[in-house]
């Protein structure tokens, strides 16, 4: 459908409730997509012959204008793990709502989050609070990298 020209952007795919099944679709619809490696670590599993080591990579992709995807991949070589993670991130791409949700600013431009956002996974809890224009990103380095790829410029 994408190659035929029936679908011209990712918003149409999400509006229809369809899923992206191939990473090449995202590359075609978002040509200015940037890719950042968040983490690469060595993981091991115990087998009957000993330990089997592999590399696990976590990659974030985004266009700095409201689209963001995160993915993980494992392989025997670092490069292959990064490639698998990048493909997984393209398949997991989503739209990030942006706006001016800070009571201090009120400019109406999409530089921050429109409201306070909380996410929890395991024992980790992440809370993103909208910030006024010019504040910057007050977060850890990994969180800054992910928020920049999503197009968020100001938040706590």
Model regions: which residues?
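Ribosome-associated RNA-binding proteins
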Residues: 1-156
